[in-house]
Regions:
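Conserved alpha/beta-hydrolase
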Residues: 77, 89-109
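The serine-hydrolase catalytic nucleophile loop
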Residues: 76-86
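Short beta-strand element of the alpha/beta-hydrolase
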Residues: 66-74
Length: 219
């Protein structure tokens, strides 16, 4: 009867709605700015500057591998090293990279680039990335990090007691300390910290220092 047909249509709509509502994150993957790569937006809720997202980048592949590597960039940086991802894939591993909140693909119009008050803020996107990679079939995850990403990743693994069961941490020129003399650390660091506390948006540069070509290429 017409009533039964209508009821079936209603049930079908409800079922489809539930499926779409609970759809896994992989359903949202889309083409990245790098050829042969895809990206996934990871909603991170809101912080002191408003809505926040992170971006997980994945090298395209025909089938998932059991081993995967996640790359975390450094300060004033983002993932663009396609050759690195290609090399990792050539060795039989899936390759992922994370653009942290307020960096690269994750910068939103209302945000100040790289703004952070506590490095632990980044733990959320690291955790979400691991979860997504696991959901795609990876049984082993290796973490590679550069510069400030090395500091963030090391702190994350220490604070979480490696609850994500990362097999290895690979550090590329990690930032663990300032490249200053002991005398400079005693004078400059307290001075900069004091200025930052009073004028948090002030840009401080060494005298006559010009932006590096590498910095300009990223910006």
């Amino acid at each position: 009867s017409d009533l039964k047909i209508q009821l079936r249509q209603i049930v079908l709509i409800l079922v489809l709605g539930c499926i779409l509502e609970g759809a896994p994150l992989w359903a949202q993957w889309r083409a990245d700015i790098l050829p042969g790569y895809s990206q996934l937006t990871l909603p991170m809720g809101a912080d002191y500057s408003g809505e926040v997202v992170a971006t997980l980048v994945r090298r395209d592949r025909t089938a998932p591998a059991e081993r995967a590597l996640l790359y975390v960039h450094g300060y004033n940086d983002y993932f663009f090293q396609a050759a690195l991802g290609d090399s990792i894939a050539a060795h039989g591993m899936d390759f992922y990279a994370l653009d942290l909140r307020k960096y690269g693909r994750s910068i939103m119009p209302h945000q100040d680039p790289f703004e952070v008050k506590d490095l632990k803020e980044y733990y959320e996107e690291l955790r979400a990335s691991m979860k997504e990679i696991r959901s795609e079939g990876a049984k082993e995850i290796y973490l590679m990090a550069h510069s400030t990403g090395g500091l963030i990743s090391s702190l994350y693994l220490e604070d979480t007691k490696n609850s994500d069961s990362i097999r290895a941490l690979i550090l590329n020129s990690p930032f663990f300390d300032f490249n200053l003399t002991k005398a400079q650390e005693k004078v400059l660091l307290p001075l900069v910290t004091s200025v930052a506390g009073l004028f948090p948006r002030t840009i401080i540069l060494p005298p006559l220092k010009k932006p590096h070509v590498y910095d300009q290429s990223l910006l």
